[in-house]
């Protein structure tokens, strides 16, 4: 699952970069992307060494968040799964969410696509107990470009 998760994040990054909203462009303006939520539903998990591809599109852009969806396709191009994600652009200085519409004059909304994603939007998970579920020893290789533990390490 972590390999698929990394492919989803890379696909999102390439898609954003091709449209002028990649991490390098955001960093020039002291912003960065952070993944807030991710939901993945698969009918079939691609086997090791089996070819697959990923399509991605932006469903919505709000002031502080954007919804990005994915279709996971087998080697014949048939959808075998979908994913939905919620991303925020944060200030690298304050670490707080930043207004997505301030970058490039709000042109990020030009990339909203009217394409269906058949799975439910990821919601917040309500924590009812304050008991730790597990512990994880962070390694240097777990840290991403933002200085956070990479989202996929949580899967």
Residue ranges and their predicted role:
Residues 151-155:
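Short, hydrophobic/π-rich interface segment
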Residues 1-51:
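Hydrophobic, proline/glycine-rich low-complexity stretches
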Residues 128-141:
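Short amphipathic
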Residues 41-124, 128:
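HotDog/MaoC-like acyl-thioester-processing domains
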Residues 28-33, 78, 127-131:
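A generic structural signal for short, non-catalytic loop/turn and secondary-structure boundary residues
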Residues 1, 101-102, 139, 150:
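Generic structural signal for alpha-helix starts
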């Amino acid at each position: 699952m972590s390999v698929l998760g990394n492919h989803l994040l890379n696909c999102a990054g390439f898609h954003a970069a091709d449209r002028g909203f990649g991490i390098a462009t955001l960093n020039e303006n002291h912003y960065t992307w952070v993944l807030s939520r991710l939901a993945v539903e698969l009918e079939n998990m691609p086997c090791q060494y089996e070819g697959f591809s990923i399509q991605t599109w932006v469903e919505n852009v709000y002031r502080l968040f954007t919804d990005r969806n994915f279709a996971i396709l087998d080697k014949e191009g048939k959808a075998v799964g979908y994913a939905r994600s919620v991303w925020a652009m944060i200030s690298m200085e304050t670490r707080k969410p930043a207004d997505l519409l301030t970058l490039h004059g709000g042109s990020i909304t030009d990339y909203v696509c009217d394409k269906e994603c058949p799975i439910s939007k990821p919601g917040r998970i309500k924590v009812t107990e304050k008991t730790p579920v597990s512990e994880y020893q962070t390694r240097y290789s777990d840290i991403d470009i933002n200085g956070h533990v990479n989202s996929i390490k949580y899967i």
